[in-house]
């Protein structure tokens, strides 16, 4: 990957790994100081996280279901979208970009929605992902686009 420092941490064989990706591209993202297990670290602000997730969803060569899952979560939390991040990726109109996200999601085959997510979520969430995730996310994006002048 370009502009990315990546490493993976595994505590035990067979257990989930922690993957850490650090984007070194200048994106205009805003960061906040957080403490995790007593270790201070800079973490992208909510608005920057949502903008970054939208960019990831639309820029990847292949669909990654966690992008859709995370986008849905962020939208349900009513987080704002950091336009500085989108502008760094040459996005000129938020409304048009959200509409492009809707089109992309509409074209995702239903049979790939659980890929990469199935082992991370419980049965109730799997049912939600299979039956509602796409339509709910599309609805939330359309509502967000509709309130933009």
Predicted regions and their residues:
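Structured mid-to-C-terminal alpha-helical surface segments
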Residues: 1-149
């Amino acid at each position: 990957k370009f502009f990315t420092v990546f490493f993976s941490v595994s505590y035990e064989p067979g257990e989930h790994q922690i993957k850490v990706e650090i984007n070194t591209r200048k994106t205009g993202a805003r960061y906040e100081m957080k403490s995790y297990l007593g270790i201070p670290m800079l973490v992208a602000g909510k608005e920057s996280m949502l903008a970054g997730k939208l960019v990831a969803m639309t820029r990847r060569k292949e669909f990654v279901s966690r992008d859709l899952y995370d986008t849905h979560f962020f939208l349900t939390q009513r987080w704002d979208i950091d336009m500085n991040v989108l502008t760094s990726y040459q996005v000129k109109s938020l409304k048009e970009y959200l509409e492009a996200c809707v089109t992309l999601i509409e074209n995702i085959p239903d049979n790939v929605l659980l890929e990469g997510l199935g082992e991370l979520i419980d049965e109730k969430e799997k049912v939600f992902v299979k039956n509602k995730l796409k339509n709910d996310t599309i609805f939330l994006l359309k509502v967000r686009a509709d309130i933009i002048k």
